[in-house]
Each structure stands twice: as C-alpha cells, then as structure tokens.
Swiss-Prot record:
Signal sequence annotation: 1-16
Compositionally biased spans, kind Low complexity: 399-424
Record-level Gene Ontology MF annotations: metal ion binding; monooxygenase activity
Gene this protein is translated from: LPMO9A
UniProt: Cu(2+) binding residues: 17, 99, 186
Species assigned in the record: Emericella nidulans (strain FGSC A4 / ATCC 38163 / CBS 112.46 / NRRL 194 / M139) (Aspergillus nidulans)
Membership in a protein family: Belongs to the polysaccharide monooxygenase AA9 family.
Cofactor(s) for this UniProt protein: Cu(2+)
Pfam annotation, one family: AA9
Application in biotechnology: Lignocellulose is the most abundant polymeric composite on Earth and is a recalcitrant but promising renewable substrate for industrial biotechnology applications. Together with cellobiose dehydrogenases (CDHs) an enzymatic system capable of oxidative cellulose cleavage is formed, which increases the efficiency of cellulases and put LPMOs at focus of biofuel research.
Disulfide-linked positions: 59-189
Name recorded for this polypeptide: AA9 family lytic polysaccharide monooxygenase A
Biological processes annotated in GO: cellulose catabolic process
GO cellular component, one term: extracellular region
C-alpha cells in the first residue's frame, strides 16, 4: 500500500478563465477560430498571461503565430468579439463572475496580418475602453457576462486602409489585492483588412510587449473589494484615439489609391472551413484506385490540427469520406458524389446585443456614430500607465520593473501537460481515447478532468502541478490550482496505469438531494465551508449528478491505496 497524502484548503469558485474565440463583422459570424490568433494548447488556452513581463501581452500565448485568414471590414464597421470559458462552446459561459475588471480594444497597422512575429512592439492605439460604470455599478466584465460573452466596438472612420491586428484585453482584478498582487490579463487578437484609402489616418501608437505592464501601474493592484470603491478607477495605458471629425470625414472620402486585400483570403475551392483549415473537393475519379485516393488524407489533417475552438466540422468531412467509401464499396467508381457542394454549416449570429457598452470611451464617439457610449463619458483618459510609450523612432519603451516576474502564478508556471490527455474536444473521431497515466514515476502528473456525462465524455480541462509520490515526502508543489469546475463531479488523478477519482461535496452548502444517487454513508458533522474528498477507483465510482462550484486554492486529501489495484478505494 502506498500512502497518498496531499497538503491542500479550499474556497468557493473563482475559477473560470476565458478566451476570445470568434469575430463577427457587422453581425456576420466569421467562424470559430477564423482570423483569430490564439493559444494553440487547448489545456491552457483560457489561462491568463503570466508573468506580466511577457511579449504574450500583445496577442496572447502563440499570438506571434499568424492565422491563415484575414477578415475584411469596412470603415466604421462594428466588430463583435465572443469570449468563452470553454473555447469549443461545449458548455456555456464566458468568464466567471468573480473576475471583475476593465476591458479595452486596440488596433495596430501591419504590412501583412498573415505574417508571423508582428504583434509585440510599437504601433498599438486604443479604440475603446470601459472600466467601472458608476451609472450601472458594473465592471466591463460584468456587462460582458450579462451580454452572453459578446463585446462590440466600432472602427473609427478615416483610418488608412490595409491590414490590422485588433487586440482585445480583459483584466480580472479578483486577486489584484493579494500579496503578491495577481492581476490577470486575458488578451487575444483578430486579423482584419480595413477597406479604405491608403492615405487615411495612421494614429500614433504605443508599445505593447514584455515592458508594458508592471505592478507599478495603480490600476493593476486595485482592490475591487473595498467598500465603497475608490473611484474613479485609475485607468492605465494610452488615451483612446479620437480622430478629428472633419479630417476623418475628408480622409474617408479620399478618392486616391484604395487598399486592396491580397493576403488572408479564403482559398479558392474551399468547401469546408474549420478555423485555419480548409477542406477541398477531391479530384474527379472514374476507377477504383481514384475512388479511395484523397478524402481520408484531408480528414486526418482536419482531426490532427484543430484549434481549441474544436473539431466539430471534422465530423462533417468524415461523413463525406464515409459516403465516398460507401459508393466505392458498391462499385460506383465515378465521382465524387455531390461534387463541389459547400459543406460549411450556416453560422449563428451574435448571441447578444451588438451595441457598444455604455459608460466607456470609444474612438467612434467624436463622429456621432451612435455607438451607445454615454455622452458624459467621452473625455479621453488622462491617467496613463508609465510603462506605455509612444512609438516615434526616437523613443523607446520604458522597461517594466524586474519584480514583475514575481507575479507569476504557479497555476501556469507549475502546470504540466499530460501527453496522453490530448483529446480535449470529446467529439467524434473513432479511436481517440482518453488520457491515462505515464507509468510508474517518482513524480506523477495531476490532470483535472471535467465530466458531465457520467464518465462517458471525460474532458481534460487543465493539467496542473506535480506531486512527489516519494514514501517520505508527499506534497503539492503548486500553491494555486484553479480547475474549471462548473457542473463537474470531481477530480481525476492519473497515476501509473490507474485512474483514481476524488469526489468532493461541500457540507451544508450543496444539499444532498441535489446528488442522485446520494453517496453511501452520512456526511461528517463539520463546518459550513468544509469540503470532504473521497478517493475512488474508476470501477468503484457510481455516477451521480452533484453540481459543485469550487475554487481549490489548497485542500487536503489523505487516502491509502495500492497503486496497482484500481479496484480499491
């Protein structure tokens, strides 16, 4: 028997990270992951940027990797961004309600949005910001949640036509007052081509890179729990760009050379879109050899390359291949059937209001564009973070304080990716198994799984922490551990070749009549905030529904079991 003891505590749920997944142009859905730069690691895609001194502050992790597509937009188009706690949309939600804080949107002109390594650096100008709206007593993130995860902005008129990166920035302040402070930035970028004159406005920009943010900026250590709040909120960064109304109108009417999109267009012949991937019609065939040739090669590529937004459309392509197989097996070697039929499903529209949130500042304000911003709130922000700098060639960015590295949260720094837990979407491809242990090691990975389908659809949602399973020194190395836990049954720990489940419920918080069937035995008499954890092997676990909302900072698990016997609990 091996004693498994983790020194771990607990708090109510404050987990629930987020990712910007989808762009809508004037209400038209461009498709999940289309024209979006995002973290390509599905297990960490929703994580905040850490530490603050990080070039990922520009467009997020993997934000220097360009998307294949650039979406066309018009002067004064409304851009709507969708944020999801589950990037593939498998469960609802945008960001946890505890994650209160401001929002901002920036733009940056680039020579080619589909080129890599053009995010961090100068050229960024702000077109929208909203922190705390005193008229509604809401933070921007609260308005985002109330609007089903949709944030809209209007492009200012008169900008020079061409390629741009559009950067969304959410700042969660729920742990900003901690020691050390832990402000959590969630940033992402869309690639757009702005139609218009090549002689339009080019706003002065600022640098966004590893030097931009530090704990010296007051807005990053703001205490949202102070009553009453200390208002106004100390906004940071550059003022929102406000074009001269008359100049913008004239620039918009310039009849000179109009910018023409050359890069990032949807490839000709693409009949199925899945984020950066396109499926192309197979070549016509008239014999048995040609009948089997091409379809499954594309299917394998679709299943093997999808972004965190999911692989839903891969099943559509697989169905096409199966239909071809059926025809081939029947001796019908003339095809393909339904040649050239577009398979991309019709996309849903914006699932919330497209009105720009009131209470903030927008570049569109000065143009009377009807953006929905309160008239009283149109003054430019004058409280700027010192780490932001304008970008004329003679100027350089102010270096961030070296202590910014101390703000790294261990949930990312100590996170370990479980190599065999790659099937994060839970959808369709035959033979895609669930993750399991790496074999006997001194250090074993902990992977947190979300299971809402009674063990039938197990999804790894976060890999975190290494546990020393040595006989004399068992401990959890990570101090913070925040799984996405809405509607989950428990934690699964993968160790060796067995799966051990830890089932938790809050005593006197979630009533047992919400857990069907009830766990055997009666709950111990303990305090209201206590969490009781029970270790089960996979075989010993009887599925039951008990919806828990937990944020596990530290907790204590003590269980004795034979690591080679998955039937013991």
């Amino acid at each position: 028997m091996r004693i498994f003891s983790l020194a771990l505590g607990f708090l109510p749920l404050v987990a629930g990270h987020t990712l910007m997944t989808t762009l809508y142009v004037d209400g038209e859905n461009q498709g999940d992951g289309v024209c979006i730069r995002m973290n390509r690691n599905a297990e960490k895609a929703t994580f905040p940027i850490s530490p603050l001194a990080n070039d990922a502050m520009a467009c997020g992790y993997d934000g220097e990797i360009a998307a294949a597509r650039t979406c066309a937009v018009s002067q004064s188009s409304t851009l709507t961004f969708e944020f999801r706690a589950y990037p593939d949309g498998s469960q609802p939600g945008s960001i946890d309600g505890s994650h209160k804080g401001p929002c901002a949107v920036y733009m940056k002109p680039v020579a080619n949005a589909t080129s890599d390594n053009n995010a961090a650096g100068d050229g960024w100008f702000k077109i929208y910001e909203l922190d705390y709206d005193s008229s509604t007593s809401q933070w921007c993130t609260e308005k985002l949640i109330a609007n089903n995860g949709f944030l809209s902005v209007q492009i200012p008129e008169g900008l020079r036509g061409g390629d741009y990166l559009v950067r969304t920035e959410l700042l969660a302040l729920h742990a900003a007052q901690d020691s050390p402070p832990d402000p959590q930035f969630y940033v992402g970028c869309a690639q757009v081509f702005l139609e218009g004159s090549e002689s339009g406005d080019v706003p002065e920009g600022v640098v966004i890179d590893a030097s931009t943010y530090s704990l010296d900026v007051p807005g990053l250590t703001y205490n949202i729990y102070t009553e009453p709040l200390e208002l106004p909120y100390p906004s940071f960064g550059p003022s929102v760009y406000q074009p001269n109304a008359s100049a913008s109108t004239e620039n918009a009417k310039v009849s000179g050379t109009q910018a023409t999109q050359k890069d990032g267009l949807q490839p000709e012949g693409c009949i199925l879109v899945r984020d950066d991937w396109c499926g192309y019609e197979v070549s016509s065939y008239s014999d048995e050899a040609g009948c089997w040739a091409e379809c499954w090669t594309q299917a394998d590529e679709c299943w093997g390359t999808y972004l965190p937004t999911g692989n839903k459309n891969c099943q559509i392509w697989q169905d096409k291949c199966t239909e071809i197989d059926t025809q081939c097996s029947a001796g019908n070697w003339n095809g393909p059937p339904n040649k050239g039929k577009v398979l991309t499903p019709e996309l849903e529209g914006v699932g919330g209001s497209m009105k720009v949130f009131s209470g903030g500042v927008s570049s569109a304000d000065s143009e009377g564009s009807g953006s929905g911003i309160d008239e009283a709130e149109t003054e430019m922000n004058t409280s700027q973070g010192a780490a932001f700098t304008s970008t004329p060639a003679a100027e350089t960015a102010v270096a961030a304080d070296a202590t910014a590295t101390a703000t790294a949260t261990t949930e990312d720094a100590e996170a370990t990716t479980a190599a065999e837990a790659a099937a994060t979407s839970g959808a369709g491809r035959p033979g895609r198994g669930h993750g399991h242990g790496r074999g006997p090691e001194v250090y074993a990975d902990i992977t947190v799984y979300d299971d809402n389908d009674h063990l039938s659809n197990i999804r790894p949602v976060i890999s975190c922490c290494k546990v020393n399973l040595g006989p004399n020194d068992s401990f959890l190395r990570a101090a913070r551990f925040a799984p996405i836990f809405s509607g989950s049954h428990g934690l699964r720990i993968d160790y060796s070749d067995t799966h051990y489940w830890l089932i938790a419920w809050p005593v006197n918080v979630v009533s047992f009549d919400q857990c069907l069937p009830q766990p055997q035995g009666s709950a111990p008499e303990t305090s209201r905030t206590a969490i009781h954890l029970f270790a089960f092997s996979r075989a010993a676990l009887s599925p039951y529904t008990c919806y828990l909302h937990l944020h596990i900072i530290e907790f204590t698990i003590s269980a004795a079991f034979d690591q080679n016997d998955a039937e013991e609990s």
